[in-house]
A protein has these predicted regions:
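N-terminal secretory/targeting leader peptides
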Residues: 2-154, 166, 171-386
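Core domains of carbohydrate- and sulfate-ester-processing enzymes
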Residues: 161-162
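Short beta-strand-centered segments that line the small-molecule binding cleft or hinge
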Residues: 157
């Protein structure tokens, strides 16, 4: 029996050897596949060690638009926001769209920007809407309003209180599309050579101030000169004016106004907040891809947030620096401030009578402010008056 078992085992071994060494090669098949060999039959091996990535679509040729700015690129805040808009859109579009900023007067004079955009002589402009309020006084109310809303309240009305809808209508009538694309919060009221002790002393002054604030100053009896921020220093130095407003303390520091006038007045009643707009030709805007319009919207929203945050953060250091140079910081006497506010009321009533758009904008803003005041008092913990 033992010999029989040994014989069977030897026979099986010889059979396996013969099958593997002789039969299988003739059939050109492996006698047995390992697990790894089984897997290899289902894998297509690359021809080389490196597999090239699929070729991406070619980036479209960059589109370049020309944007006239009312503010020099080196000017803090206003010029800074214009340059920032240029950079932001370039990066958001991945280098496909460029809204190139041009310095004031390079493309067209600043007071001709709106006509140049409308005729497509240039592609866009960046400025406060007061620069084109000669087309419609209602644009003043989307720029800066004497004794008007704070920056927060202003933006709330624009974006969620009915302001934007009216603004869009006004721009459409001009063949334009406009976006709120920057902001300056509360400013200083002005720089003066001497302290101003009375309304009579104020009336005798020559003041560099434009916009609605300039109309108010004229109404109380003072003389005004409409100046760009960059021209204020020269006008003060040459004694062409007795005082002037420019912007926020950090901007005024850069302009060097403290070197000439030592009396700095607050509050900035004429411009509690100033909106900066980007305007483009209406047809050109509609012809942009939706993605491009969304990028411009996003860049403008970012600019507004930046302008508000930075504009508030920088002012204390500027004021501290002014005091080191002997500047005296004043607040207006009620004997001067109240007559200015009454003068503004008279002016805005007259403007409303002569322009239905102005009245419609003012009524919308007034209604919003009345309702907003209730929330502001409650949220601030201020006792409400019955």
């Amino acid at each position: 029996m033992r010999n029989l078992v040994v014989g069977v085992v030897v026979g099986l071994v010889i059979g396996v050897v013969l099958g593997s060494a002789i039969v299988a090669p003739r059939l050109k098949l492996p006698a047995h596949k390992t697990f790894s060999q089984e897997q290899d039959t289902n894998i297509t091996k690359p021809a080389s060690r490196f597999v090239s990535a699929p070729r991406s679509k070619r980036k479209p040729a960059p589109v370049h638009w020309r944007m006239a700015s009312a503010y020099a690129s080196q000017m803090p805040q206003m010029g800074e926001q214009a340059q920032r808009l240029d950079n932001s859109i370039w990066h958001l579009s991945d280098g496909v769209f460029r809204l190139k900023m041009y310095e004031p007067g390079t493309l067209v004079p600043s007071n001709q920007m709106v006509d140049a955009v409308r005729s497509q002589a240039i592609d866009a402009a960046f400025a406060a809407p007061s620069f084109w309020a000669h087309k419609n006084p209602a644009f003043h109310l989307f720029s800066a309003i004497p004794f008007g809303p704070s920056a927060q309240e202003y933006l709330s009305w624009i974006f969620d209180g009915g302001g934007r809808e009216i603004m869009d209508e006004l721009y459409n009538h001009q063949g334009l599309h406009g976006l709120v694309c920057g902001i300056i919060a509360s400013e200083g009221s002005g720089w003066f050579r001497d302290p101003i002790e009375s309304l009579e002393a104020f009336k005798a002054l020559r003041i560099g101030m434009g916009g609605l604030g300039g109309l108010v100053v004229q109404q109380v009896g003072a003389k005004t000169m409409n100046l760009n921020e960059g021209d204020v220093f020269v006008a003060l130095k040459k004694v062409m004016i007795d005082g002037a407003e420019a912007s926020q303390p950090a901007v005024d520091m850069d302009l060097g106004l403290h070197e000439i006038a030592r009396h700095y007045y607050f509050p900035g009643w004429h411009q509690p907040a100033t909106l900066l707009h980007l305007i483009v030709n209406g047809d050109a805007w509609l012809n942009l891809p939706k993605s491009r319009r969304a990028q411009i919207d996003a860049a403008c929203a970012s600019n507004v947030a930046y302008g508000l945050a930075v504009g508030e953060a920088r002012q204390f250091n500027a004021l501290r620096e002014f005091t080191k140079h002997g500047v005296r910081i004043h607040t207006w006497s009620p004997d001067i401030l109240l007559p200015l506010e009454k003068a503004w009321t008279k002016i805005r009533v007259e403007l409303g009578k002569g322009n239905q758009d102005f009245k419609r904008v003012w009524d919308s803003l007034t209604k919003f402010r009345e309702e907003y005041a209730i929330w502001r008092e409650i949220s601030a913990g201020t006792p409400m008056q019955n």
